[in-house]
């Protein structure tokens, strides 16, 4: 029983840490073509993509007024 609890806690912690990588992603393009020997070799074309996504306060509940996310204000920056 204890082994299952420890395994479940470790799996949950791993999923939480794996999701943290998505939260620190950057939308800036920073590619570089270094030491390219020809005219057409090593050309880099990157387009920075920024899509503001508002995901705070989006929960599903049966009774919306008792929801802890009710009344939250979210702003896209």
Swiss-Prot record:
It is found in: Cell surface; Secreted, Cell wall; Fimbrium. Disulfide bonds join 56-74. Induction: Highly expressed in 24 hour cultures while still submerged, during aerial hyphae formation on minimal medium, decreases once aerial growth ceases. Strongly expressed in aerial hyphae (at protein level). During aerial hyphae formation and sporulation on rich medium, under control of ECF sigma factor BldN; more strongly expressed when sporulation is blocked by deletion of whiB, whiD or whiH. Expression depends on bldB but not bldA, bldD or bldH (at protein level). Residues 38-54, 57-72 are annotated as: Forms amyloid fibrils in vitro. Residues 36-76 form the Chaplin domain. Residues 1-25 form the signal peptide. Disruption phenotype: A single chpH disruption and double chpC-chpH knockout have no visible or sporulation phenotype; a quadruple chpA-chpC-chpD-chpH knockout has delayed aerial hyphae formation and sporulation. A quintuple chpA-chpB-chpC-chpD-chpH knockout has a longer delay in aerial hyphae formation and an almost complete lack of sporulation. The quintuple knockout still expresses ChpE, ChpF and ChpG. Quintuple knockout chpA-chpB-chpC-chpD-chpH has strongly delayed aerial hyphae formation, makes many fewer aerial hyphae but no effect on viability of the spores produced. Its main location: other. One of its GO terms (molecular function) is identical protein binding. GO terms for cellular component: cell surface; extracellular region; pilus. Keywords: Amyloid, Cell adhesion, Cell wall, Disulfide bond, Fimbrium, Secreted, Signal. One of its GO terms (biological process) is cell adhesion. It holds the Pfam family ChpA-C. The small chaplin mixture (a cell wall extract of an rdlA-rdlB knockout) forms a stable coat on a number of surfaces (including Teflon and cotton) and emulsifies oil-water mixtures, which could be useful in medical and technical applications. Coiled coil: none annotated. Has 2 domains capable of forming beta amyloid structures, both of which are required for aerial hyphae formation while the N-terminal region is not required for rodlet formation. One of 8 partially redundant surface-active proteins required for efficient formation of aerial mycelium; the short chaplins assemble into a hydrophobic, amyloidal fibrillar surface layer that envelopes and protects aerial hyphae and spores, presumably anchored to the long chaplins. Chaplins have an overlapping function with the surface-active SapB peptide; chaplins are essential on minimal medium while on rich medium both chaplins and SapB are required for efficient aerial hyphae formation. Chaplins are also involved in cell attachment to a hydrophobic surface. Homodimer; disulfide linked. About 10% of ChpH isolated from cell wall forms disulfide-bonded homodimers. Belongs to the chaplin family. Short chaplin subfamily. This is Chaplin-H. It comes from Streptomyces coelicolor (strain ATCC BAA-471 / A3(2) / M145). The lineage of its organism: Bacteria, Bacillati, Actinomycetota, Actinomycetes, Kitasatosporales.
């Amino acid at each position: 029983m204890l082994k299952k609890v420890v395994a479940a806690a470790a799996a949950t912690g791993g999923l939480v840490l794996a999701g943290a990588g998505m939260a620190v992603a950057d939308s800036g393009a920073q590619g570089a073509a270094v030491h390219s020997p020809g005219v057409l070799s090593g050309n880099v074309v990157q387009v920075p993509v920024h899509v503001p996504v508002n995901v705070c306060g989006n929960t599903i509940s049966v009774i919306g007024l008792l929801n802890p996310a009710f009344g939250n204000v979210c702003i896209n920056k």
